[in-house]
C-alpha cells in the first residue's frame, strides 16, 4: 500500500508526524509522503520515524494556489525556499492578527491551520465569510506558475491535487484546466483520491494518459475522525480501494527530474 497525500499536526492534521508514520506502518503501507499545507516543518520528524519503522518516506508539501487549487510537491530535496515562504506567510498573519487585537498566545496555535483559522475568525465575528478572512488576514494564494516553479526549484514533482475539489473545475473543463497548468510545467495529477466515484477515477486516469502526466494517488488523510479519508485508500466511503501500487514505478523513475 502507498499514500502520497497526507497531513500531520504541522498543518491541519490531528496526528504528529511520527504518529502518522506509525499508523501507516500498522496499516501496512510501504511508501508514504507527508504533504502538509504550505510548510515542511514535519518532514524531519516523519523521515526519522519512517527510518525506525522501515517504511519508505517521501518529502512533500501541499501548496495553496489561486482558485482554491492545491498543488502537491513530491520528492522534495531542498527546503529553504518553502521555509522562507512559510516564514513570510506566518509573519503576515501575525501582523494582521495583531492589528485585530490578538496576542501571540492566541494566534500561535492557529498559524498553519488555515481552514480552522478561517472558521474561528468567522465564528468570532472578525470576518463575514471565507473570502473576507482570506483578503484581510491571509496572504493571497500562490499563482500556479509560482507554486510549480517553487516545487521544481526544491527538487520536487508538481502534482495537481484532488481536481474534483477545485473551485469552478468539473468534468467539462478539467481538460482545459490541465492544458493551462501544463503551460506552467505541471508534472502529474492525483488520479486516485478520496471521495470520488470509479467513473471519475477512470475519467481522470484517461486525462492523465492523454496529457502525458504522471498519475499519483493520496487519501488526503487528516484525522482518525474523518472516516471518509483512510490512509492508503481512495474512492467513495462505501467503495474504498487501496491506492494502486502500479503508479509507484513511474513516480520513482521521475523523482530526480529536477535535481
Question: Positions of the model-derived regions?
Answer:
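An N-terminally biased module of ancient metal coordination in phosphate/nucleic-acid-related enzymes
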Residues: 1-67, 137, 142-226
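Conserved, well-ordered active-site substructure
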Residues: 229-242
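Extended substrate/RNA-proximal surfaces in nucleic-acid metabolism proteins
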Residues: 48-182, 239-258
